[in-house]
Each structure stands twice: as structure tokens, then as C-alpha cells.
Amino acid sequence: MKQIYLDNGATSFPKAPGVGQAMKDYIEKVGVNVNRSSYRATAEAALSTLTVREDLCRLFGAGEDPSYAIFTSGVTMSLNMIMKGALHPGDHLIISGMEHNAVARPATQLEAAGVAVSIAPCDGDGVLRLEEFEKLITPKTRLVVMQYASNVSGTIQPMGEIGAICRRHGVLLAVDSAQAAGHFAFDMQKLQIDALCFTGHKGLLGPSGIGGFVMNEAMNKALTPLIAGGTGSMSASLEMPPTLPDRCLLYT
């Protein structure tokens, strides 16, 4: 009996043609760390990594500097890095009532740590009520985190209007694109998104365990990196390198 897979909101299947072969080829023919030495295979690995960063910036309309594309284990890690790296006790965070637990649970942890959290209401279709959302913004509002699209309701949020409101008030906007990336085109700069968090295993048709975020300089300045360790750069220093992408260490 032929099986028809309908759970693509959880993870895509089958993956895009060539994904499995590309992974196999990399493991068998390259398979080394980036930035750890100067022999040919490490140069090939570095070039592959740089190329993916450039592709991500083009795909998401993030500008031309690939160092602002940071690799993580997926959208959950990316959202945690942004939310917990940008917010401090006394700050104010706004999320919507439609958020996935990848946003709602970090928000709950941050609230317990002294960050004020507001939940912006949505209408019966799950669309953000823009006027009520804007009224929640205060002088202490530092970050807004919103999902772009929902795999529960099918709602696509009016991200351009949300971005315009945030920019008008000088508030950073981070977007959970888990259910949007790969499904439809969008431009971070035009939408005034400061950080776009993505995962590889849904609409981008890649494997599980990969993802990241692409950000602008405003978000970079706001972030305190949460993870420290070896980067293959400035190894004599006990401080993390100040430059991107090594500053935001995960899978650099």
C-alpha cells in the first residue's frame, strides 16, 4: 500500500533531492573542522561554510555580509540565544498568544528571572491585533518575538506592519520562521526584521539538527553571547573573539 506523508509541519519528508548524497559526500570526502588548521580539506570546509552563509543571506534578504549568519542546532536554540542574550532583568519582552513553546517557554524562564513579559492578543484567525500590540510597547520594551507562520492555524502574520511598528518605537524584532522559511519568499531588510531564526528540517527540506539565525548589526550589538569555547580564532585569548561569526559560537 502506498503511504502518503502529511506531517510536514513537524518535519519535511522526503527531503529535497540530493540532500542525503551531499551529506554523505561531505562526511566521506571532506569531514574536517573549519578554522582548525591550514591544509586543503580545512580550506574546503571553510569555503563550504562561507558559501552556505552567503546563500542564507540572499535567501532571507539579510544583506551582503555572511558573517551575520550564525549556525545552531535549530530554531529553538536560535530563539533561546536571541531572547536570553538580548534581555536582562528590568527589560520588557512582547510575544503573541500564538507562539510555539520554543518562544513561550524561554519567555516564562525570562519572566522568572525579572524580565517583564506581555502577550499580545490575536483575533479568531490567529492574526495579531496590531493596535493592541502597539499599545503594549513601553520605554522598557527591548524585544518583540513573533512567529511568522503557524502550522496549527495556518496563520501568516503581517510581518511588514509588525516590523514597522517595532522600528518606529526603536524595539528589536526577532522572528520565528520555522513554518515560513522555504515556504514563501520574504526579505528581512524590507520587513525590518532584526533577527530571523530558522530550522533546516521543515520547509528548507534539510536534515534535523541544523538551523541558525541571521541578524543585523543592531541585534548583534544587543546580544550577550551565551556560549563560550574554541573557535579556531584568537586561540591565545581567554575572551571570545569580538568579531562575527565567532563571537556567537555554536557551530561556526
Language-model features and meaning:
Residues 1-250:
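Pyridoxal 5′-phosphate
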